[in-house]
A protein has these predicted regions:
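Basic nucleic-acid-binding alpha-helical/helix-turn surface characteristic of O6-alkylguanine DNA
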Residues: 1-119, 167-171
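Active-site and channel-lining beta-strand-loop segments
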Residues: 18, 142-144
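Active-site phosphate/pyrophosphate- and oxyanion-stabilizing loops and adjacent acidic/basic residues
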Residues: 40, 122, 162
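N-terminal alpha-helical segment
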Residues: 93, 144-145
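Regulatory, non-catalytic segments
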Residues: 120-131
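Short Lys/Arg-enriched helix C-cap and helix-to-coil transition segments
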Residues: 135-142
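…primarily DNA-binding HTH/wHTH and HhH modules…
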Residues: 145-171
Length: 171
């Protein structure tokens, strides 16, 4: 996935980033421990991208992400994603995760069952652990069996996941 540009922006959980191509977002970055580390992570993920002002469609996506993280019920389904280079199974997992409404959760096994692969819960978890579009592909809404929080690969780990779920629940 080749990004043309990226930008950082403020949210209730910290300074996030997005990178984009002509076809949509190619990546979303949750906050690192500092703005510098978030920027460095974006440069690491998208070395050919320039930090620049976003085009109008990306500005709209950023505004929707900010609103969702403020607790507004928005599924972000209208945000275009450029999944060029995303493995077919991962793409299917991300598409299934995008159907989980804000404030709701599913287990990894539930997502696997929706894909017609009920024994693929671990593979679903691995795909979500590599999710290049956190928030827009709401991997935070997918839990381990029995309602356990499961893992979360973003900075802050499961505490960040719990915070995102609480924001969606209006807490």
């Amino acid at each position: 996935m080749t990004a043309h540009g990226f930008t950082l922006f403020d949210t209730t959980i910290g300074r996030c980033g997005v990178a984009w191509s002509d076809r949509g977002l190619v990546g979303v970055q949750l906050p690192e421990s500092s703005e510098k580390m978030t920027r460095d992570r974006m440069l690491q993920r998208f070395p050919a991208a320039a930090e620049t002002a976003p085009p109008p469609n990306v500005r709209i996506a950023i505004d929707e992400i900010i609103a969702m993280l403020r607790g507004e019920r928005n599924d972000l389904a209208a945000i275009a994603l450029d999944m060029d280079g995303v493995a077919p199974f991962h793409r299917r997992v991300y598409e299934a995760a995008r159907t989980i409404p804000p404030g709701r959760t599913l287990a990894y096994g539930d997502v696997a069952a929706r894909l017609g692969a009920p024994r693929a819960a671990r593979a679903v978890g691995q795909a979500l652990g590599r999710n290049p579009f956190p928030i827009v592909v709401p991997c935070h809404r997918v839990l381990a069996a029995g309602g356990k929080i499961g893992g979360f690969s973003a900075h802050g780990g499961t505490a960040t996941k719990r915070r995102m779920l609480a924001l969606e629940a209006g807490e």
